[in-house]
Regions:
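Iron-sulfur-associated redox domains of electron-transfer enzymes in respiratory
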Residues: 1-221
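Active-site-flanking alpha-helical
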Residues: 100, 249-253, 327
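Ferredoxin-type iron-sulfur electron-transfer modules in oxidoreductases and energy-metabolism complexes
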Residues: 213-236, 254-346
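Extended amphipathic alpha-helical segments enriched in small hydrophobics
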Residues: 235-245
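A donor-sugar binding/catalytic signature common to diverse glycosyltransferases
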Residues: 243-259
């Protein structure tokens, strides 16, 4: 294990950015999101949760797929180049890292998404443990330990020092690249770190949503959950704004669109939301026609369909962003609690 003083982190960021792109939490206009590092960036590692998840690094909100060029009567198709430059995402929390694993199951399964696969190949994740989990957090419900994030490099901020462990080959390579800025940790440091982990877990145990029950949400009771009358009242406050889907670290739905460049056409994909009335709109009109159906689909996918098809892995990581951002205060916690209270299938 290594360590580096907090006041030396700027030098660490500079060293990393000399050879590859570096993305980390940066405050802009009062909001913190993952941005490319620059020497004058207002880095905010102490922020527990960015407004949006850092999934943009691997699954951008918008990306070009290919261009069709027109030259008289001739057309040529030019595929967009795949990601080739290495990059580091620094400061990811355990919940967001689990979110990437959910995306992996989708985009790295056959047929493999080459754009996503290239970014995963060239990306290195540096995790940071959650020093003070917030009341909206419920990652523990999904078996996530925010005190022990699993990534290429795991870090903890303790008493003004960043502790650094690198369990993967990518992590080892990054460690060697910045080794001159790191110092070896000793036994006292190891004790401090274990004390920090214990303190973090103690906070998690006291969070208001830490005891949510997922009983019956693993796909075994699909029909009962789907047909439950609970949905008929639960969905009504939903505004169909899609905020929950855009801040969520596991949502992977996208649309594909074309736009005229004046010299041809660019085809690109962009995030979409299952909460929108035109989501999956097709000529034969089989998209879900009511807000109730769309609302039910979102949470059935998170809690039933996805785990049923992915060895019990849920498509929610308990980050709490939907809890904080929904303007109608309607979120996955309320859904789970509603079924706990009313039995769901009664």
């Amino acid at each position: 294990m290594y360590k580096i003083a907090k006041e030396n982190l700027s030098a660490l960021f500079q060293s990393i950015a000399e050879n590859q792109e570096l993305y980390l939490p940066v405050e802009v206009s009062g909001q913190v999101n993952y941005k490319a590092w620059t020497p004058d960036a207002k880095v905010s590692l102490e922020t527990l949760k960015t407004v949006k998840s850092p999934k943009d690094a691997f699954f951008p909100q918008s990306e070009n797929l290919y261009t069709v060029q027109r030259d008289g009567k001739k057309l040529s198709i030019q595929p967009e180049a795949l990601k080739e430059q290495n990059f580091v995402v620094f400061g990811m929390k355990a919940c967001d890292i689990q979110g990437v694993k959910v995306l992996d199951n989708v985009f790295l399964s056959d047929p493999v998404d080459s754009f996503y696969a290239a970014r995963r190949e060239h990306g290195t994740i540096v995790a940071m443990a959650c020093h003070e989990p917030e009341e909206s957090c419920f990652c523990k419900v999904f078996g996530i330990d925010c005190a022990e994030p699993a990534a290429d490099v795991a870090t903890w901020m303790v008493d003004g020092e960043l502790y650094w462990k690198a369990p993967t080959d990518k992590g080892e390579a990054l460690t060697k690249a910045v080794e001159s800025l790191l110092t070896e940790a000793d036994g006292t440091d190891a004790e401090k770190l274990e004390t920090e982990k214990t303190a973090i877990r103690a906070i998690v145990e006291k969070l208001p949503y830490s005891d949510l029950s997922l009983e019956g949400w693993n796909g075994d009771a699909l029909t009962e959950k789907f047909n439950s009358p609970v949905w008929e009242e639960l969905y009504k406050p939903c505004l169909a704004c899609g905020t929950c889907t855009f801040v969520c670290p596991t949502c992977q739905c996208y649309d594909i669109k074309d736009y005229d460049t004046g010299h041809g056409v660019k085809r690109y994909r962009c995030w979409d939301s299952c909460m929108y009335s035109d989501f999956t709109m097709m000529a034969h009109g089989n998209n879900r026609t009511s807000q109730l159906q769309r609302f039910r689909q979102r949470f059935m996918h998170k809690l039933v369909y996805y785990p049923a098809n992915n060895n019990g892995m849920y498509s929610c990581v308990g980050c709490g962003r939907c809890v904080e951002k929904c303007p109608a205060s309607l979120n996955i916690v309320k859904v789970i609690k509603a079924f706990e209270k009313q039995g769901g299938d009664k």
